[in-house]
Amino acid sequence: MSSDTSASRPPQPDTGTASKSESENPAIPSPHPKSNAPLTNRDWWPNQIDVSRLHPHVAEANPLGEDFDYAEEFAKLDVEALKADVISVMTTSQDWWPADYGHYGGLFIRMSWHAAGTYRIHDGRGGGGQGMQRFAPLNSWPDNVSLDKARRLLWPVKKKYGNKISWADLIIFAGNCALESMGFKTFGFAFGREDVWEPEEILWGEEDEWLGTDKRYPGTGERELAQPYGATTMGLIYVNPEGPEGKPDPIAAAIDIRETFGRMAMNDEETAALIVGGHSFGKTHGAGDADLVGPEPEAAPIEQQGLGWKSSYGTGVGKDAITSGLEVVWTPTPTKWDNTFLETLYGYEWELTKSPAGAWQFTAKDGAGAGTIPDPFGGPGRAPTMLVTDISLRESPIYRDITRRWLDHPEELADAFAKAWYKLLHRDMGPVSRFLGPWVPEPQLWQDPVPPVDHPLVDDNDVAALKDKVLASGLSVPQLVKTAWSAAGSYRNTDKRGGANGGRLRLQPQRNWEANEPSELDKVLPVLEKIQQDFNASASGGKKISLADLIVLAGSAAVEKAAKDAGYEISVHFAPGRTDASQESTDVDSFAVLEPRADGFRNFARPGEKAPLEQLLLERAYLLGVTGPEMTVLVGGLRALGANHGGSKHGVFTDRPGALTNDFFVNLLDMGTEWKASETAENVYEGHDRATGALKWTATANDLVFGSNSVLRALAEVYAQDDNQGKFVEDFVAAWVKVMNNDRFDLK
């Protein structure tokens, strides 16, 4: 919400509600699919799962090659020189896009904010970690008008430093530099974001017009934002700055603010700090008729070379710029950090007005403060102005107490903004082990910290001895496999959270998640803890093993035994080095969003789940970062191992449960079986012998999709072949190790 945010057309005087025009911002015509475009498979069969989603960034698309190591290149970078060059760009105004007040700081803050601010907690998608703002749809969102210019201003810096700095890092770093150049002391900064080279399909909303809201609010009478969305409005980062659906109601806007910032993992104080801090700099742009603004970058003529929103109002730039349609300068010191945002907010009474572009905003009442706000290009002074969402900070009891306290204690605001800004920029990056550079501060609670290894690790002999103890403990193969999967399977590749490291399976809230079968964990974990304690008490040389490591090792031992029982000798790679986090270093509320509503790998779904199970399986595979073949072999192997939730027999197509066989695929593809939906159990299918009618198997959609979907059937056929039983075991073990090590960034 810093600097410009996209405006919607203001409510019409006779109704007080937002316009129902094609796009609420008249400057941004809403694009529509061409009616005569060739139909895709998705158009013809929209309910089929799209396995290609599991391969979003193919190696062939990367011009730097598979061997490129960003961390290695970054190590060659002079970060102080980079900072100096970014600040130089920021303070050197260009005629083709003149800088407000001679400083692009506000623009760069908005660019960084709008890159990082797409992050959402429910599925970990969004954020600035891959440089996605360069691509559609983000590069053409109404909320990102003119950020194409910000990135273009940075091109000389990117060109100079080349592969040593990614676009993803540079976009985020520029905003941090902007704050520092204007006198703000930041909390820290980490590099380490690697670029991708093509856009990723993310469901930002089901609306088919910019600034639509109808599909994300179910219309039940309650304003309840559907999951997993993080914004109230299609094409905006958070909320409509004019108020919900363009109705200028600061109290209603505050409710939306709280919801959307909460979905980005921000509490009330962090939310207020970000708004106050971000709006302490720069201005918004709504100099004239927004109908004179041209199409977004993706729809702009080829000769504009990737720049969009070309305006024919006056010069189209500088004093004539139109970005959001709002024309607000928040403070008398727009290029300097101080407390004048709050001094201005509370120093005047406010009345509703409209910008020159017709957008709702507030101005100081009765002409108070006229001339106290400087013009960005040396013109006459202006009156104080605020967005509807700024007034929310004063009028809403949610934020009033917080901001009034900061009015009297600006040092508390500075501290809160520094930490909230750091969190905003880094929330999607995962643990600090992924961070690069000299300015990384100590780990924060929201980063799910794990302690460092402070002891010698187990060696190969220790690993072998521990495997023997685990297998002799009385715990079964399914118990050991399910426990390891419960730990490692919590990982989300989107925001690098979850996983086995930290041993948080033994802590709240994960220990009580329904998917993890708490009653089973109560049987398994004490046995593993006793093995751990006995080893740590007797091992030579101070060697120790964490419970996090032992959980993974025990699952790997079970896989080896299951392979041996199927006739194959194979070693499952194990890399020690995980540590055990404490309950105090685990934010229970933050971890709650990781709880799976379904996990098709374990054939689990919460009772009453309405979404198609096969779609939820694909989503779980996406979050784990596994490919189509890996998802296929994992499901088949886990069924053979008996790793279903609750010991269910659905999909266990074998008379040798516990042995790592390819029986799942062989029997699924057997044409001697006829499948029908069960008449007695919801979401269950029954496989009957075609000749006798006898019941042979039961299954869910998580199982049958591998015979139904043409892409997955092709993969299943590979693993069902007589000559690929060994390949099945090898591929399962490789995929298993990948999942177990997903969060071991120290190994990568």
From Swiss-Prot:
Cofactor annotation: heme b
Post-translational modification, as annotated: Formation of the three residue Trp-Tyr-Met cross-link is important for the catalase, but not the peroxidase activity of the enzyme.
Binding residue positions for heme b: H279
Cofactor note: Binds 1 heme b (iron(II)-protoporphyrin IX) group per dimer.
Pfam families the UniProt entry points to: peroxidase
Cross-link (Tryptophyl-tyrosyl-methioninium (Tyr-Met) (with W-113)): Y238-M264
Key words of the record: Heme, Hydrogen peroxide, Iron, Metal-binding, Oxidoreductase, Peroxidase
Site (Transition state stabilizer): R110
Bias type Polar residues, positions: 1-20
EC number, as in UniProt: 1.11.1.21
Gene Ontology cellular component terms for the protein in this record: cytosol
Enzyme class: oxidoreductase
Chain intervals for the UniProt region annotation (Disordered): 1-43
Catalysed reactions listed for this entry: H2O2 + AH2 = A + 2 H2O; 2 H2O2 = O2 + 2 H2O
Residue location of crosslink Tryptophyl-tyrosyl-methioninium (Trp-Tyr) (with M-264): W113-Y238
Quaternary context: Homodimer or homotetramer.
Role of this protein: Bifunctional enzyme with both catalase and broad-spectrum peroxidase activity.
Protein family according to the UniProt entry: Belongs to the peroxidase family. Peroxidase/catalase subfamily.
Record's protein name: Catalase-peroxidase
Species, as recorded: Mycobacterium avium (strain 104)
